[in-house]
Curated annotation (Swiss-Prot):
Species this protein is from: Aeromonas hydrophila subsp. hydrophila (strain ATCC 7966 / DSM 30187 / BCRC 13018 / CCUG 14551 / JCM 1027 / KCTC 2358 / NCIMB 9240 / NCTC 8049)
Transmembrane segments: 41-61, 64-84, 94-114
Involved pathway(s): Bacterial outer membrane biogenesis; lipopolysaccharide biosynthesis
Main location: membrane
GO molecular function: carbohydrate derivative transmembrane transporter activity
Function: Translocates 4-amino-4-deoxy-L-arabinose-phosphoundecaprenol (alpha-L-Ara4N-phosphoundecaprenol) from the cytoplasmic to the periplasmic side of the inner membrane.
Oligomeric and partner information: Heterodimer of ArnE and ArnF.
EamA domain sequence ranges: 43-112
Membrane topology, record value: Multi-pass membrane protein
Name this polypeptide is given: Probable 4-amino-4-deoxy-L-arabinose-phosphoundecaprenol flippase subunit ArnE
Keyword terms of this UniProt record: Cell inner membrane, Cell membrane, Lipid A biosynthesis, Lipid biosynthesis, Lipid metabolism, Lipopolysaccharide biosynthesis, Membrane, Transmembrane, Transmembrane helix, Transport
GO cellular component term of the entry, any: plasma membrane
Biological process, per Gene Ontology: lipid A biosynthetic process; lipopolysaccharide biosynthetic process
Length: 114
């Protein structure tokens, strides 16, 4: 159960990052003032996702050792890289993909799955 909650923290955190990027993209398409930026639905959704992720993270820290939980957050790097490619069509280098592979192997080792 805790591993599933940890995965949810990763998804909320990465979702929040993707929403922040989308907020910036929307501001570039249609310039607006600071007040309008703060009221952006994308920005509000990102704050909600990141806030929920933080609350769930605090809950998990009561149940899991930090030495096990924190390294598992490296999955965030993988998810953000894949999300940036899928949603924002960013170019990802060969070295980045090799790094993703290393991160996945490391997370599996830390989680005792390899």
């Amino acid at each position: 159960m805790d591993i599933l909650l940890l995965l949810l923290v990763c998804l909320l955190t990465c979702g929040g990052q993707m929403l922040q990027k989308q907020a910036v993209v929307s501001w570039q398409r249609r310039p607006c003032n600071h007040w309008q930026k703060l009221r952006s639905p994308w920005l509000i959704a990102s704050v909600a996702a990141l806030g929920c992720g933080m609350l769930l993270w605090i809950y998990l820290l009561q149940r899991l050792p930090l030495s096990m939980a924190y390294p598992m957050l490296s999955i965030n790097l993988v998810l953000v890289l894949v999300g940036s490619r899928l949603f924002f069509h960013e170019q990802i280098s060969y070295h980045n993909w090799l790094g993703v592979g290393a991160i996945i192997v490391g997370a599996l080792l830390l989680g005792g799955l390899l």
